[in-house]
């Protein structure tokens, strides 16, 4: 089946509400997602792509460039990766990851990285490991 990966657009808002809600565990309103799209449009480093197959949005990839202060290098950060539940295990996530890695190469990045939370070891962490990613540390968060 043919597919395309393209930048997210306002027409995608209903599907984006669903996918981002699945990922975050929170309900997002169309106004929330419209705000996020506006932020991405105004950002010099953030990008949001959709995987579309047969005119149906099936997956979502958030990507941004991270410049390092401590060394002269940059990385591509995969900030969002999710597919519709019925599309999991069908290669959509792999295609989106490959797209992100190529985008990072095209922008002169040293590599790609992502953050994946606890409780996702059975699916997401195994998926990332199969793609060649290695766990290198922890993220520490303090609510304010």
Task: Give the positions of each predicted feature.
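Residue-level recognition of the GNAT/N-acetyltransferase active site
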Residues: 9, 66, 84, 88, ...
